[in-house]
Curated annotation (Swiss-Prot):
GO biological process: aspartyl-tRNA aminoacylation
Alphabetical list of PROSITE patterns matching this protein: AA_TRNA_LIGASE_II
Subcellular location: Cytoplasm
Chain positions recorded as ATP binding sites: R217, D218, E219, Q226, E482, G534, L535, D536, R537
GO molecular function: aspartate-tRNA ligase activity; ATP binding; nucleic acid binding
Keywords for this protein: Aminoacyl-tRNA synthetase, ATP-binding, Cytoplasm, Ligase, Nucleotide-binding, Protein biosynthesis
Protein name as catalogued: Aspartate--tRNA ligase
Catalytic activity: tRNA(Asp) + L-aspartate + ATP = L-aspartyl-tRNA(Asp) + AMP + diphosphate
Naturally occurring in which organism (per UniProt): Vibrio vulnificus (strain CMCP6)
Family: Belongs to the class-II aminoacyl-tRNA synthetase family. Type 1 subfamily.
Length: 592
């Protein structure tokens, strides 16, 4: 039906007759001529309809926004004075010769010329996607997916599909369950990742695997999470963690170069412990110059228990952030930041303004200065390299609370005060994660997943002292977002059973949930390692937006609902009966 896309027309086609299909973006009547901005997925071009073309003019007179039309016309260059530099096709226009209405449109429930609510946009997503901004994002996503496939194909990886209906295994989040009609009372689980299947593919000898795959997690949502998301899943045999990081870093660097013409440069590598110490986060945004500085040794002997208590607690921490120019913050602003850190469990936010460094104690303004000696204050000023006009903000509590609260405050201050270098890129690798993390009851949980290999330990050594073990894991971080994470996997049954034991998974449960994996590990399993990228998050960064819903064609809300299709919905009673499922929600509600 068409010979060209609207957005592809240029001066080289002047004089040629073209056929276009698309939508009326805008229609204007000017001095007898009708002008139509015609739009398709590739862009917009101006169409001129002259009254001399009677049939086309009669049709053009009926057009309204979002009518679907077909146009036949001649490409002509615009006079220099009429060139529209705001349009990619602004040097040309189409003189209409034939015009056909393919389909009319009702008045839209969305106004493309103003900001619509997200609820309206999601309810009428098929209309929202017509907006050039949204169309460009979805096209960039397609280019990113195409690039990934091309890169991995060229590097010897095989695209292999893994099951979607599978077995529930503990991977950190709740599973989406699918009832079996054939095996009544039993359920499949939708995969949170293809983790075990890709490891089994390595045991099958496929060496290098990849898949762009849907994954499902029933977890609390936020701006950069969805119940169903897309993963670039990668696994390799006979490659070290350094080699896996090298090939995946190369992929991301070449992707940014091809799609954005940006050279990310070589990624620095930072141990987990350093990331937490300096930035309070295992995914630090290095565009932000603010850092956490430990001062526990300076305040451990002061009479102020708010500081000395955590400073002398092996699980405590006292750290500060020096904010350049922060002495200008008002008391109201400081109170607002205090309320902000309260969200993360901090009990307060002590502060110290350095109004005049040269004036000694006279130049210091702080509600806690009276509890600190001049030597302690000078020690803090020297360690933080504070200057006149700065403010120092304190965190003193359990180490995890201090890291989380000051880490979040660091990001907020960076944005609020314009310290974060927007429009730049700061990638890095975070490595050497703890193997386990401890809950409030003292139980150990896998920080990544239970198939991650420890670094430099035998099974016996790990079982003897598991808490301080370091895992052979690595995360790729970009501008404060974890865009990919992976590890070297456990490749022998003894080590895997040891990890399960440490996590409190007894022998019977191991056999029930992971018997197939433990069996497979007995048959000459190769060393293997891998990594998975969140495609949605990568594309979100490529597009310069902060919400992955902006780069998914048909996303869910933060309540995991689809406003367009009204999913999830109540199931047909006959279908539930066939599945031997009884719904108790209504009974529970009536009982309340």
């Amino acid at each position: 039906m068409r010979t060209h896309y609207c957005g592809h027309l240029n001066k080289s086609l002047a004089g040629q007759t073209v056929e276009l299909c698309g939508w009326v973006n805008r229609r204007r009547d000017l001095g007898g001529l009708i002008f139509i901005d015609m739009r398709d997925r590739e862009g917009i071009v101006q169409v001129v309809v002259d009254p001399d073309m009677a049939d086309a003019y009669a049709v053009a007179s009926q057009l309204r926004n979002e009518f679907c039309i077909k146009l036949t016309g001649e490409v002509r260059t615009r006079p220099e004075s009429q060139v529209n530099k705001e349009m990619a096709t602004g040097e040309v226009e189409i003189l209409a010769k034939g015009l056909e209405i393919i389909n009319r449109s009702d008045v839209l429930p969305l106004d493309f010329n103003q900001k619509n609510s997200e609820e309206q946009r999601l309810k009428y997503r098929y209309l929202d996607l017509r907006r050039p901004e949204m169309s460009d994002r979805i096209k960039l996503r397609a280019k990113a997916s195409s690039f990934v496939r091309r890169f991995l194909d060229d590097n010897g990886f095989l695209d292999i599909e893994t099951p979607v209906l599978t077995k529930a295994t503990p991977e950190g989040a709740r599973d989406y369950l699918v009832p079996s009609r054939v095996h009544k009372g039993s359920f499949y689980a939708l995969p949170q990742s293809p983790q075990l299947f890709k490891q089994l593919l390595m045991m099958s000898g496929f060496d290098r695997y990849y898949q762009i795959v849907k994954c499902f997690r029933d977890e609390d949502l936020r701006a950069d999470r969805q119940p169903e998301f897309t993963q670039i899943d990668i696994e390799t045999s006979f490659m070290t963690s350094d080699q896996v990081r090298a090939v995946t870093e190369k992929m991301v660097r070449e992707m940014w170069l091809e799609l954005l013409n940006v050279d990310l440069g070589e990624f620095p590598v930072m141990p987990f412990s350093e990331a937490i110490r300096r930035f309070g986060s295992d995914k630090p945004d290095l565009r932000n110059p603010l850092e956490l500085v430990d001062v526990a040794d300076l305040v451990k002997d002061v009479d102020f228990k708010v500081f000395s208590g955590p400073a002398n607690d092996e699980k405590g921490r006292v750290a500060v952030i020096r904010v350049p120019g922060g002495a200008e913050l008002t008391r109201k602003q400081i109170d607002e930041y205090t309320g902000f850190v309260n969200i993360y469990g901090a009990k307060g936010l002590a502060w110290m303004k350095v109004n005049d460094r040269a004036a000694g104690m006279e130049g210091i303004q702080s509600p806690v200065a009276k509890f600190l000696s001049e030597d302690v204050i000078n020690g803090i000023l020297e360690r933080t390299q504070a200057e006149s006009g700065d403010i120092i903000l304190f965190g003193a509590d359990k180490a995890n609370i201090v890291a989380e609260a000051l880490g979040a405050l660091r990001l907020k201050l960076g944005k609020d005060l314009g310290l974060t270098k927007e429009g730049t890129w700061a990638p890095l690798w975070v490595v050497d994660f703890p193997m386990f993390e401890e809950d409030d009851e003292g139980n150990l949980h896998a920080m990544h997943h239970p198939f991650t290999s420890p670094l430099g330990l035998t099974a016996e050594e790990l079982k003897a002292n598991p808490a301080p073990a370091i895992s052979n894991a690595y995360d790729m971080v970009l501008n404060g977002y974890e865009v990919g994470g992976g590890s070297v996997r456990i490749h022998n049954a003894e080590m895997q059973a040891a990890v399960f034991d440490i996590l409190g998974i007894d022998a019977d449960e191991q056999k029930l949930k992971f018997g197939f994996l433990l069996d497979a590990l007995k048959f000459g399993t190769p060393p293997h390692a891998g990594l998975a990228f969140g495609l949605d998050r990568l594309v979100m960064l490529l597009c310069g937006t902060e919400n992955i819903r902006d780069v998914i064609a048909f996303p869910k809300t933060t309540a995991a609902a689809c406003l367009m299709t009204d999913a999830p919905s109540v199931a047909n009673p006959a279908a539930l009966e066939e599945l031997a499922i009884a719904v108790t929600v209504a009974k529970e509600k009536s009982a309340e």
